Amino acid sequence: MRTEIQTGKKVFPRTVSFLLALLMLLGAMSTVGCGKEQVEEPSTVTDAPEETDNYQKDNLPDTLNYEGREFCTLYWNGAPFVEFEPEENATNALSQSVYERNDNVENRLNVVLTWRGIDGDNSHQTKFITYLESTIGSNLHEYDLVASYSMCAGAMAMRGYSVDLMSTDYFDYEQPWWPNELTSQAVVNNKLYFASGDISTNLLWNMYAVFYNKDLMEKLGITDNMATLVKNYQWDWDTMLSLSKDVYVDLDTIPGKSLGDQFGFGIYRVYADALFYGSGFRTVETDSATGELILSPTFGSGDVQSLIVEMLDYFETDDAWYDNGEGWSTKDYFVNDQFLFDLRPLYYAPQVIFAQDTKKEVNFGVLPVPMYYSDQGKYYTSVGFPYSIYSLPIDAKDISCSSAVLECLASEGYRKTTPVVFEQTMKLRYSEDDVVSAMFDVIRENLTFDLGRLFCSSFNKGAYSNATYYLFRTVAIAGNNPNWISIYKGEEGAMADVLDDIYTKLK
């Protein structure tokens, strides 16, 4: 029996056109210490962003003046794209825009922004949290703001290291630079301990989408107008399966399926979460009557069971390639016309556009993650984990100042960095037509967040760590286990206990 899935509010209520793809940008590498980070510059210079005076302004008082005080942000090393502090003479548009964002904040508030980067990506989460314990936990007043890998923010809040943003002077959650659904999903007892949005360039790059190869589609004689399918809410799971059927060709003559062959669809195992959220499912909700956190009725539902069974059956056919880590390439298979559809984060777009290390130009389009049911009536875009979430440390020297800088960074990012990532880069430079750009708008406008994902590192009381994503992604899909109801029931009690802990500690 299908369960009713509630649809959330549309995210990012602004008219920013959606664009991607900067010229071979590399993640910023930095050294520990509140100084300037070193950014490896691309070989090609892109134009600086145009003025964006038509964008909404914040409500920060013009009279704010912190008299040139140093404001130090602790951030995680390893962010895929530049976000924190580029060099002043950076030659690419994104680095320039981040520099201008920071410069505007310094001039508006009369602060001197300094930065300290430490290891803190997926493989260094424990190291990052341990360092927080030695500084914030010891009340040393070293940092005014923390920008953490997304999985760390919930752990930071659970340890009592984060300030309730709603209680601060200048955080304005109703502004367009804070995604509606992120702020609403992360609120517990009317308190919000972290936020992200236009303040994090890496959030924008890590949205999931489906790339499709137009040349291969034409070669196969597929005449469906993909934009029309999306517009008419006909881009669903069944449609994708139908279009990808009988695309398989044994190109390398190796017996059985192999990465050298041609497929209708390809996906890497860590991206499977996108199909869960694209179907409108959640792991955690807020009880409308009590305000308490509960496991979403959709999480353990028969609908998820059905999706898993269909995914596993599909991945067993020659139509699809599910990669469990055997040798997944960043771009080669799609670039070489071996996949008709390829589900990836959007940071894949520059690699496809430039066909790095190849001489081949790729004629491609992008689509939102397909709906599960045709009558779902809404697309849902989830985000990969490598983006930043910002928190105010409990021992910040001046909470009001930290609140002002946080709001100003996000506000200036909305006007400076986001237009570069979206407008000055992909749409005006690389999109071949308005249809491609419109698809990016659909992807961004339907961003979805889930408290169970935001606090995933806390869900470790049962048999599995990070249970809110691990059960679906790894136990069911990677483990080729279709018995979802049994899997869920085995962890349900432990996950409910974690929600009680979160609710108690954050109220």
Label the predicted regions:
Residues 108-189, 358:
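Extracytoplasmic "Venus flytrap"/periplasmic binding protein-like
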Residues 356-428:
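Extracytoplasmic/periplasmic substrate-recognition and gating elements
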Residues 391-403, 413-507:
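Conserved C-terminal helix/tail region of periplasmic/extracytoplasmic solute-binding proteins
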